[in-house]
Amino acid sequence: MSEIITAKHSPRIDNNIFYWYEHDTFAIQLEINLIAKETGEPIVVKDTDQMIICFYKNNIPIHKFCYTNFNNGHKFVLDFSHEVSKKFTEGTYEYRIIYVGSNKTTIVAKNFAEVEKWVIQI
């Protein structure tokens, strides 16, 4: 009897790499808790502040998510709709998260995402 090999969960984070399959559509909620280095106190994200998540392939910008109005705390949703997902072909991407409050601060740099090819073999 033959077995069907199942796909790995998509999207997923494994060894600090964000994976998903090419053409997948999904929404993933992120929550970022910022701590002031000087005081050790939490930084309160204001409604006027901004989070920018940028994806690059070979240092070429692929897509940018921008969020304001943080009325739900420090949470925001990356919506990989059909329009967004089709920008991401198989391969490795770098992503960065920038917080813009009273200052502009890179809070995540040189993290990686891997878009995997799905192949149907008969």
Enumerate the predicted regions with their spans:
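Contiguous segments within soluble domain cores/interaction surfaces
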Residues: 1-122
